Amino acid sequence: MSKEERIYFENELLARLKSLEWPGLTLTAVKKGLKFRLGKELVAQLDFQYLVKAQAYTLLGRVFGGPIFECCSKIVPPYRSNLGSDACFSFTTSGRQDKRFSTNVYGTISAPEIEEVGAVCSHIRAALENYYIPLVAGCILPSQRTIEDVLASPTDYAYPALFIRCAVAFKPEIISKEKLKEVMSNKKIVKNKDFDLSLLSVLEDLAVG
């Protein structure tokens, strides 16, 4: 892929992403990504990373603001974060085999030929709209899917038990008693029994059903 072809593709992708929206948040398409604001505060980003040798793109996401992040920042767990950053949630599609971003098992989308640009841009927009934007939004403003997302991939969260505690404290109706039991029995969420279970047990009175 020539530099000119790459610039053309990235400009076309930017144009396709400009109309994306999410309730309660302001989404701004920028070159190689999407920014999320809560009010005027920048709280999260989705970024496309170009891999020169592979001539392909991966998608990265980070949440570093919002009510859940602020709550998590006030408590220091007695063990290491799953993440190598200050974010409360972070992921990369590189190496993921879920095929949500790409159709291959590498988690990458090959840089398209000129005649394929339209189709690839449509595919990426659909992937963001249907999965990645709701995923990131649920880490900023808790919703019914927030707990399910943590259960699906706990290692994408700095401290998954603390994250759930803060999300439910902000919006108690997002968890049921049955779901709380599932959370408390998950070894990838409960990494330190004394600390994490004490955090989560507080939610028993808040859980519905």
Language-model features, listed with the residues they occupy:
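Amphipathic alpha-helical segments
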Residues: 6-28
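Long, charged, glycine-rich C-terminal linkers/tails
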Residues: 28-35
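Intrinsically disordered, low-complexity regulatory regions enriched in serine/threonine/proline
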Residues: 2-10, 35-209
